[in-house]
Amino acid sequence: MNGRVDYLVTEEEINLTRGPSGLGFNIVGGTDQQYVSNDSGIYVSRIKENGAAALDGRLQEGDKILSVNGQDLKNLLHQDAVDLFRNAGYAVSLRVQHRLQVQNGPIGHRGEGDPSGIPIFMVLVPVFALTMVAAWAFMRYRQQL
């Protein structure tokens, strides 16, 4: 295995209506607080339960927000991005980049520790038991063979 992780990157327009607790998410990033190495973008750090973003369901933690109401978020200080969100109005349009991890390896491959795979002992115990029975039968009946 080469250790490479592949991602499928998609973009989506998400329209939110500001609720009593704002837009319902927190952000990280900016030119002064890089969240991702060599990327000064603005990312969703937390979705607030029952907030506008959670009720909509499309915005996810880790999503990169590219623009707010058509205004690009590139090369902004963190506080400038926060101010942009706070002053965005009641109806807010977000251009968002989702990164989905893509399976790396052959089809049907299970990663180590994957709970949906069959545990190794579930295979080894029956194989060991069958081997023991075969060895016992061979020893018991070898004179008759």
UniProtKB/Swiss-Prot annotation:
Keywords: Membrane, Mitochondrion, Mitochondrion outer membrane, Transmembrane, Transmembrane helix
Keyword match Coiled coil: no
All ranges on the Cytoplasmic side of the membrane: 1-117
Mitochondrial intermembrane side: 139-145
Domain of life assignment: Eukaryota
A GO cellular component annotation in the UniProt record: mitochondrion
Residue spans crossing the bilayer: 118-138
Alphabetical GO biological process terms: negative regulation of angiogenesis; negative regulation of endothelial cell migration; negative regulation of endothelial cell proliferation; negative regulation of ERK1 and ERK2 cascade; negative regulation of sprouting angiogenesis; protein targeting; regulation of endocytosis; regulation of Notch signaling pathway
Subcellular localization: Mitochondrion outer membrane
Domain PDZ stretches: 13-100
Organism: Homo sapiens (Human)
Subunit structure, as described in the record: Binds (via the PDZ domain) to isoform 2A of SYNJ2 (via the unique motif in the C-terminus). Interacts (via C-terminus) with RALBP1. Interacts (via PDZ domain) with ACVR2A (via C-terminus) and ACVR2B (via C-terminus). Forms a ternary complex with ACVR2A and RALBP1. Interacts with MAPK12. Interacts with DLL1; enhances DLL1 protein stability, and promotes notch signaling in endothelial cells.
Protein name, as recorded: Synaptojanin-2-binding protein
Protein role: Regulates endocytosis of activin type 2 receptor kinases through the Ral/RALBP1-dependent pathway and may be involved in suppression of activin-induced signal transduction.
